[in-house]
Amino acid sequence: MITATWPFFGTTGTRPTVVILAATLGIFAPGQDGFAQGCIPARHIALSLGAEGITYLEPNHWDISLSYRYLHSADIFSGYDEQPQFKAGGSNNVTTIHSFAVGLTYAFTTRLSASLFLPFTDGEGTNMHDDGKRHTMHAGGLGDIRLVGNAWLWDPARNPKGNILLSLGVKAPTGDYRATDYFYTRTGPVLRPVHVSIQPGDGGWGIVPEVQAYRQILQNAYGYLAGFYLINPRVKNGTETLRPTPGHVVINSVPDQYQGRAGLSYVVWPEQGVALSLGARIDGIPVRDLIGGGDDGFRQAGFAIYLDPGLIISRGRYTFSLSGPVALVRNEEQSVRDAKAGVRSFGGFADFLIVASISRRF
């Protein structure tokens, strides 16, 4: 969550009201926001505007940010319906992921900037193993690094009440997508790849177009819109699923991912740079990718829609944001592989997320 920051303006003449909106726009996210493989969103992908907003970053200035996201999933869904029998029988997958992202942005002009994201993750998954007992598998480390170019559509000086930021990024497969841990069989522990939801990387190069926009509606009130779509051209990454079907090897897909957010932000205390926001958020993985379409690899496609409240505080060179998206709708869609086999798809979803960010400009 980087910043291509925003103008200070408002009736108080102290901190701008818009600064806060920038924080609202990039409140996630994303490092590696994001996403849906078996636990939407499994990978945290930060929007390049960042949860930090501050001002339009001046030429030759920097902004550094640190974001965090907490995810805990224990509920299993098939389609829109929760499947409580898994939890009741002790066979549900429980996933916990702590995601961090360090972001760095450099402004070439007031309209053009570049951002670098270094994501890190620490995840664990607990489920029933073949020995009839529940065990926990763990994976963590550096995720998939992303380099992003950002451009404001209009001159900030001439358009202080609204603007659109267009970004285009490249995701490199720097995260481990073959992480292993011990899986317990009836004859003892064996090393196997961990579930795809806690793999630090997905194993593919990606292209990430983004758009973020804001518009002043009333004094101290702003509407915002933000989203990205990760295009992963690679079809499969060569890593087997955690529990391959006997006699049939199933390889993990490298799926596309997407996120969208929209809502309102209101500066409740302009003199102290304090604002509240409320909006909606959707995270997901499509059944079929833009490039390559649908494949017979292992993917857990679906989406989650959240009510997305937030708090933003901007003081001096620092901006802090906190968001707590609460799930309203969860849908585990049937994958191409499961459709061919004539079976239902199942996947875990979080009830809520906790997302925090702090940034400083130089």
Regions found by a protein language model. Give the residues of each.
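Short loop/turn motifs that connect adjacent beta-strands in outer-membrane beta-barrel proteins
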Residues: 37-40, 53-61, 73-75, 111, ...
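Residues on the lipid-exposed face of transmembrane beta-strands in outer-membrane beta-barrel proteins
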Residues: 54, 66-68, 102-106, 116, ...
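Residues that define the transmembrane beta-barrel architecture of outer-membrane proteins
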Residues: 60, 96-100, 139-145, 162, ...
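Transmembrane beta-barrel strands of outer-membrane/channel proteins
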Residues: 64-70, 116-120, 166-172, 225-229, ...
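Surface-exposed strand-loop-strand hairpins of Gram-negative outer-membrane beta-barrel proteins
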Residues: 70-99, 197
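Outer membrane beta-barrel transmembrane domains
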Residues: 77-87, 235-362
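Surface-exposed loop and membrane-interface regions of Gram-negative outer-membrane beta-barrel proteins
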Residues: 84-95, 108-146, 294
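Outer-membrane pore/translocation modules
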Residues: 122-253
